[in-house]
Amino acid sequence: MSGGAYWPRPWSCEDGGNRRLGVPEGQVGPGIRPEEGLEVTAVKDAFATDMVIRREPGELYALRHGLPLGNPLVASVEGWVEKLDPETLEVTASTPRLPAGRFWPGGIGAHENGDIYMVFGRWAHRLSPGLEVLASHSLPVDRPHNSFVVLDGGELVTKDCDAPEARH
């Protein structure tokens, strides 16, 4: 990863890292030769899934959430993280529904300490790789927050969404 104290595997956070290149660093591509093809092995209808990250081989995590009723920047929602089997996309573990507050897509990332962090709405949650909730914290600004980045020192940095509809 270029910058940030992320888990040292490709695609362990939103957009592939702090530089937001949208590509998994450290991989040159899938290596498909002209005589080879791709095959779909699983399809999963997972409505309201914002993003998927990897940690170790075989570990795939999805950020899920409820949908707000009415104005999405005012209505309160819950979010959760699911661990998926990478071959079947079946859910192998899940957090409980976690408080989020007002809706904004948020994000998840695998930290270099091994834990999964989730920033969604006005809440930050720390999760074990098995998706036990280790800590939850309501962020100080009562507005939804837009995901996060992890700095080289391991600190998480997020920003609130200052959309006019999000203000009281």
Predicted regions and their residues:
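Conserved beta-propeller blade signature
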Residues: 12, 59-61, 115-117, 155-157
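A short helix->beta-strand "capping" segment at the edge of beta-propeller domains
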Residues: 18-47
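Repeated scaffold domains used in trafficking and secretory/extracellular systems
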Residues: 45-52, 100-109, 141-153
